[in-house]
């Protein structure tokens, strides 16, 4: 099975048409997942039951486990555990022009930068597209849920 966050629009259209559904129904899949932030097939309210059954035979919703959150004035660093036990870092940075999320594209790193926990681990593997998207959705969801978007940048570097 594949992480549903790795599913491209073109792949979804092909899957639907090969199984007798209209390709235009693909929009509801992506609205459910990315606009409505469904975290499971039961939360996909715009997608028909038949299409959800088809998807659930081939895909799963990847989940990241938060191991640790480190906070500073304008930065939140998340340590996530992937489904296979590998760890990755994701950083939310609040700046005067807005917020940005720095995601990991691999588990571990061979560079050895002192400021980065990933650099302390040997590279284990590259992440899938779904694992990268999951980082954005996890931190983005926390921004909305905890109203982090209303928190101003208050350090001197932002002024």
Describe the function of each predicted region.
Residues 1-99:
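Flexible, acidic/Gly-rich N-terminal and inter-domain linker regions that tether
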